[in-house]
């Protein structure tokens, strides 16, 4: 059977280990959550067909390891990305403080043609933990960070409960489309599958 021609949009998810990158991806693609996911080794990806404005395209979502020893894999995985999703745990100040490092790492490794306008989306995950009583990063602080980076969209999610995950990825898909360089590829009818972690989201200014 001949392959179908689709528009492929590549999305990279970055953030510290344990913030819920895998769970977010799996909740969005497979509508599933598990506490049993192992740490991602290197990188993995899932794909999902999405329809937007009467167009069908394939969203290829890359889940990368948060451990520093795997960051050297970045060039191969980051190149060609149409959108970068930065994820932190609202219950971990360190994961929030490391966002600048992840953003800079991506810009260096991916070398986008227009770094000033490259689309990023920020997700504050695990808002469900301890009913929010363990939270250490306020929504105000996160939005201030987004404002300092050119008013990038911000969502607060729970991959476990599924809160705002769909909304966040709808925004991510729109930003990926708007980023311009859509890559037309011939893809087989089979779809790769990957892994998962935790999250949730709020408002998008797309």
Swiss-Prot record:
Regulation: Regulated by guanine nucleotide exchange factors (GEFs) which promote the exchange of bound GDP for free GTP. Regulated by the MON1-CCZ1 complex which serves as a link between Rab5 and Rab7 protein families in PVCs and mediates PVC maturation.
UniProt entry tagged with the keyword Acetylation: no
S-S pairs: none
Membrane topology per record: Lipid-anchor
Gene3D superfamilies the UniProt entry points to: P-loop containing nucleotide triphosphate hydrolases (3.40.50.300)
A GO CC term attached to the entry: nucleus
Positions carrying Cysteine methyl ester: 206
Keyword tRNA processing recorded: no
Molecular functions (GO terms): GTP binding; GTPase activity
Protein role: Essential for trafficking from prevacuolar compartments to vacuoles. Involved in the trafficking of newly synthesized protein to vacuoles. Essential for plant growth. Participates in the recruitment of the core retromer components to the endosomal membrane by interacting with VPS35A.
Family the entry assigns: Belongs to the small GTPase superfamily. Rab family.
Subunit structure: Interacts with VPS35A.
Name of the protein in its database record: Ras-related protein RABG3f
Source organism phylogeny: Eukaryota, Viridiplantae, Streptophyta, Embryophyta, Tracheophyta
